[in-house]
Amino acid sequence: MEVLATDTVSQQERLQAIAEKRRKQAEIESKRRQLEDDRRQLQYLKSKALRERWLLEGTPSSASEGDEDMRKQMQEDEQKARSLEESITRLEKEIDVLEFGESAPAAPKENSAAPSPIRPHSTSPAKEEQKSETMVNAQQTPLGTPKENRKSTPVRSPGGSTMMKAAMYSVEITVEKDKVTGETRVLSSTTLLPRDPLPQGVKVYEDETKVVHAVDGLSENGIQPLSSSEVDELIHKADEVTLSEAGSTTGPAEPRGLAEDVTRTTPSRREITGVEAQPGEATSGPPGIQPGQEPPVTMVFMGYQNVEDEAETKKVLGLQDTIKAELVVIEDSVTPREPAPLNGSAAELPATKEENQTGPTTTPSDTQDLDMKKPRCRCCSVM
């Protein structure tokens, strides 16, 4: 029965402490809102007084009723400003008292080594329990002593109980510090599962989400605790190293064979006026099948260019300084034709005799047909 009564009393005290804390939070919020309103009103009064003073300085020395009213208003505004300044100072002190309690101000540096005075007994049992627990934890884990690795991080709930939050993963980071510049360089980063055995070391940083231990690397001056910014920078560098390693292993440079295959699949035939494309030159096979051909060339498309001038077109296509030649193909016939003489009368008689002796010969129409059957002339450019 006594144990149950004690538990009930402690539970009631905790509820009272929580209610008191909420009441203080609400009071602090209301005082802060009032403080902001007073500051805005004080700023308005100061700017108004400055404007009125500037107007009074520009008026002539002869006083008038309007000037007297303005001076009276300035005096009233100054009194309001003084009262607002006092109210602001009082609210700031009250907020400090509500946030930090009725603790004494910080002692000077020369008295910092003196033992702390006995605290008043006005604090609630819940606060006393929390303070004593904090002191015990501080005595159990002094700075610089090794501590066993834990796979979970303790998180204190609002009710005051300690709840263990399981760790999702661990990261082992190997760093190297330059003694001259003091720069820290990350050598490697390895992700460990929570079930893997964690190496033992000295805890240098801890918060609600992560714990950092220093392993194998004791410096001459001992291990210094890390700040949150240093931990974030270290994690960022480790992520960069991990990404660079992943890129070097999974994303190698494209081999030449792949580039050649891509080049072979793309059409390489290009029609240019004056150049005849041969059938064997349209595509190039693999180097192993046709050793006589040259290896393919990778071409990069740089864009289109609209050219209207013929000279500019030749310049763009590389045909500016070329020589044009005409190729004429002559086929052999049954009776080669002799060139006609300058005077056709002398050769007409033998021709008629030969026609009477040998029979009919080729007519001009047949000659025309023979000329039409000849291949057409082709124009080529000699580069």
Swiss-Prot record:
Q: Which residues carry this modification: Cysteine methyl ester?
A: 380
- In the record, N-acetylmethionine modifications are located at 1
Q: Which residues form the propeptide?
A: 381-383
UniProt GO cellular component terms: apicolateral plasma membrane; axon; basolateral plasma membrane; cytoplasm; cytoplasmic side of plasma membrane; dendrite membrane; dendritic spine membrane; filopodium
Gene Ontology molecular-function annotations: D3 dopamine receptor binding
Q: Does the keyword Cell membrane apply?
A: yes
Spell out the subcellular localization from the entry. Cell membrane; Cell projection, Filopodium membrane; Cell projection, Axon; Cell projection, Dendrite
Residues where Phosphothreonine occurs?
141, 145, 153, 242, 361-363, 367
Where does the record place Polar residues bias?
133-143, 357-367
Can you tell me which residues the record assigns to a coiled coil? 7-101
Protein family per UniProt = Belongs to the paralemmin family.
**What does the subunit section of this Swiss-Prot or TrEMBL entry state?**
Interacts with dopamine receptor DRD3.
This protein's name: Paralemmin-1
